[in-house]
């Protein structure tokens, strides 16, 4: 590694140029004593710094001057800075109390790192002393400042990673002078570990190679690695710690059992110290030379590796056996025997992080942020494993890190009963029944091609005439769900709210059948229904349709608030019948209000109540009467306040009438429609008027049902949510306009306190889109949320059905492919074990190749290679099928004599052999074997003219050559059994070849056949047998040759 000397950069030099003394930093203040009678107090309040190569800003002289000018200045020094020449500096942000700080022991700069408060026991709490936010600048010693931009960017990236891993914030890296700048919230130790320094090609020399002083001369590096304060290993890195033992106890036992050994070590320690201190007096000594000098006397202690700890608030004093860290590293501790703690890691309440108005002890969140090193992670189906406190636990008791908690996201809460158990009936009524109804509706299919495959994306189509029947069908399903035993109160509340939503959809978006539609429907049975058609068509008045819809909405609103009216009335206990009347009017229960007024003898008020919400003339008359009373100075103290409020309400002044009352948003909307706006106002005008008052903060917010009618059982976001009923009203009033509230409208919080429940909202969205209320392709959160719910209950087929209804987008063309394939692969065991689901998925038009591929991966994972092979063949993954056939299937079938199955599988891939790598050296080997074996057996059994032995031998030689080449190509991928199968094939072929050598009397040809056998991968015993036969044949050949020669 190239050595480098960096000249003192201007920033640090400028900070250090005020230093008058380079050897002693605690200056004499005799001259200053005359300036102030409290000189002794000032001297005692100053920080102490004796290290020759450290500097301060403001310097000691400036601190004295400012302390004289402004008493207690040292308790509030702005932007206090301390640094070491050639190593870096720290600028503490804000005002810092530096009184009586022993800076020599508190701040230590080393090569590529800085340590503040080495001793954890003396470190103050965060925010006090020097344990506060600061900006750190370290000098990074890179080997060559002339590197290119790519290398510099690599170093900057490594530094940024190291900074963020230690809980600090990376600011900048200046390659011109090697300055690494970052922000820290508090202190222990920050810098680069040994491994990180090696990764970014740091220089091996300690410090800055040879740090440069202010006078241009090199300063000796007095680092902690060269001082004997680190001569002994930390207990956390000792052998007992790696063996799972308590190093403190082992140290204590060693001291008790071998006291003399400690004295010997102390003697060695002193000798080693003397030797090393002598070596430190030599300047510009290479690191290798220093090590050589140490080794000349005694081997140095091994290098201590510092591994990161994951938690920022970790106190190393709590667990002596934990490894050190670059994040909150355990520093060198005294080796005095201490009593070790037997418990696990605990997070002290004093070290928690304040969040808004409370404290967080979310070890789980910290674990998920820091990663696997903190032993936390997600499993399938929303399972979380961690070592922190249970998520919903309210206990203040600390937890041990050795306790692993398993928790699961309640994505299936909608099918729980009051005891928190899943009920099959709820699964059917919440998921399967609504989806079955959705599937029965008319659909249009859009075929979209993805390469060689295609999907049939679906969309529901319907019209507003049949919307009423669809809504009634959904309501019937919900009513059956309400009959399930064991439902919690909150579950019943949400189900009733779903009924209200479907009723409102029917009121706002359905249409009555026109005359033309009735005539078309009657054409098939004209004689029977023509009279009914005429009667129905006579009743339809197009101009009256808005008023009919308004009346239906009024009835819906009366029904939805009736229970709130009864609750308010029951709270009165008959104390005031006027308040009773007022509450009845908020729900438009005019009949009951009139009867109550009559029963109390208030006949005139009953007459006014009977006309409430009617003609605006009556309202104006009451309003004029109230104005007349006020103008004439009527003393309203003689009239009940409740009666005045009734008059105000009847006059249309709903805000004056509601001064002392708090009502829900639906009743306020009703008062606006019934008593304030004209009786012929259309619904869009009513909804917009309410929205205008809402924007002016003059109307109650349309809060969701779980806030409006009681505390929610689950998690409730702090954001201001609105009820889906309100969004339906906005959607009706803005059908011809642009609207941007769909994301919020179809969020889970618009109808339930469960942020993961989308099971009914998805149907709302689908039906509203089908009738043309809106069109959107940006509601993927809704779709995927519902998919996750279905998958949590094992309803994979319905999950795929929902995916097919996601609108196609050009910017995400492969969204459907990705999601469907992920479902098939991840939940293969579920859908493949149920024939009904498998058939349902096929009927949806999902490519069978995807299903076979998922099954192949599943069977391969579980070691069922025969089934995996069949599935890979079915999905036309020929290369993968061929690989499994050769490495896992073929040899087992061959050794079990299942030759017909081998032939079937091999021939099924033979047509695609051009797509398969090494086919001739793979499955082609088996096919060649059977063909060659069959040919040799036919030659031996038939009486026809035999094939010449030369030709047969050549065929066998080619086969043997391919066997050997196949073994070389497949190598270690072939198990021992496959090699046995190869030996069996070679043995059978060689036996057939050598079984009848008499068909060719030529001894040379016969010996050539033996050469073929010797090249084959035969077992040694078989090879020995053939060798004996070959020797016999060769002897015979020699004898025959001798006879001929004689």
Swiss-Prot record:
GO terms for biological process: defense response; innate immune response-activating signaling pathway; long-day photoperiodism, flowering; mRNA transport; protein transport; response to auxin. It is found in: Nucleus membrane; Nucleus, Nuclear pore complex. One of its GO terms (cellular component) is nuclear envelope. Residues 283-304 are annotated as: Disordered. Keywords: Membrane, mRNA transport, Nuclear pore complex, Nucleus, Phosphoprotein, Plant defense, Protein transport, Stress response, Translocation, Transport. Its main location: nucleus. It comes from the Eukaryota. Residues 51-187 form the Peptidase S59 domain. GO terms for molecular function: porin activity; structural constituent of nuclear pore. Expressed in roots, leaves, stems, flowers and siliques. Residues 283-295 have a biased composition (Polar residues). It is a peripheral membrane protein. InterPro entries: Nucleoporin_S59-like (IPR037665), Nup98_auto-Pept-S59_dom (IPR007230), Nup98_auto-Pept-S59_dom_sf (IPR036903), Nup98_C (IPR021967). PROSITE patterns: NUP_C (PS51434). PANTHER family: NUCLEAR PORE COMPLEX PROTEIN NUP96, NUCLEOPORIN. Part of the nuclear pore complex (NPC). The NPC has an eight-fold symmetrical structure comprising a central transport channel and two rings, the cytoplasmic and nuclear rings, to which eight filaments are attached. The cytoplasmic filaments have loose ends, while the nuclear filaments are joined in a distal ring, forming a nuclear basket. NPCs are highly dynamic in configuration and composition, and can be devided in 3 subcomplexes, the NUP62 subcomplex, the NUP107-160 subcomplex and the NUP93 subcomplex, containing approximately 30 different nucleoporin proteins. Contributes to the transfer of mature mRNA from the nucleus to the cytosol. Required for both R gene-mediated and basal disease resistance. RNA export seems to play a critical role in stress responses and regulation of plant growth and development. Unlike in mammals and yeast, NUP96 and NUP98 are not translated as a polyprotein. This is Nuclear pore complex protein NUP96. The gene is NUP96.
